């Protein structure tokens, strides 16, 4: 699985699924799919964001950048 994060602060693209709790991190099932989505948004998005594989370390970093505990992070596939 892959996520797209803002290069400056590593905050991932998220989706608001409910009124309370943290937003869910949007995931893609393959790097090419995530890159295609990013490129479809234009050059500014490509310059500002990067595609990262979801690993224990990257998930911990994304949770930290969102200000939540790693165990509170929810992943949701794109499109949802």
Predicted feature residues:
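Short, mixed-charge low-complexity intrinsically disordered segments
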Residues: 39-80
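Extended catalytic/binding region for NAD+/ADP-ribose chemistry, centered on the ART fold
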Residues: 20-37
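Short, surface-exposed beta-strand-loop junctions and turns on beta-sheet-rich folds
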Residues: 11, 20, 33, 42-44
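Short aromatic-glycine-(Arg/Gly/Cys) micro-motifs in beta-strand/loop hairpins
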Residues: 1-24
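Hydrophobic beta-strand residues in large extracellular and virion-surface proteins
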Residues: 3-5, 28, 34, 51, ...
